[in-house]
């Protein structure tokens, strides 16, 4: 179950109306001290632990970041399965411009 307390309406709409891929978990993260805003999506762990990566990209808004993370995580599930790996799919999307956000934490 995903805790979406306080999530913006556009993010909730994306989560509940665009996720036809049956994701296991979606986590919205924010750390004000470091400036981190991120979405972590786990599509499937049916074959094993989720395997994926992180995208650090200047996405326009949180709803687009959620949609991006959902699509990328689903794609990782399919790629891992087709490669014969015993892993599911997951992906993290960090919202921000890596050229401008240069805190030590990030």
Curated annotation (Swiss-Prot):
PANTHER family: LEUCINE DEHYDROGENASE, VALINE DEHYDROGENASE. InterPro entries: Aminoacid_DH-like_N_sf, Glu/Leu/Phe/Val/Trp_DH_dimer, Glu/Leu/Phe/Val_DH_AS, Glu/Phe/Leu/Val/Trp_DH_bac/arc. Oxidative deamination of branched-chain amino acids. The catabolism of valine is the major source of fatty acid precursors for macrolide biosynthesis and a vital source of antibiotic precursors. This is Valine dehydrogenase. It is found in: Cytoplasm. Its EC number is 1.4.1.23. GO terms for cellular component: cytoplasm. Homodimer. GO terms for molecular function: valine dehydrogenase (NAD+) activity. SUPFAM superfamilies: Aminoacid dehydrogenase-like, N-terminal domain. The active site is at 91. Keywords: Branched-chain amino acid catabolism, Cytoplasm, NAD, Oxidoreductase. The lineage of its organism: Bacteria, Bacillati, Actinomycetota, Actinomycetes, Kitasatosporales. It comes from Streptomyces ambofaciens. It is an enzyme of class 1 (oxidoreductase). GO terms for biological process: valine catabolic process. Belongs to the Glu/Leu/Phe/Val dehydrogenases family. It catalyses: L-valine + NAD(+) + H2O = 3-methyl-2-oxobutanoate + NH4(+) + NADH + H(+). Pathway: Amino-acid degradation; L-valine degradation.
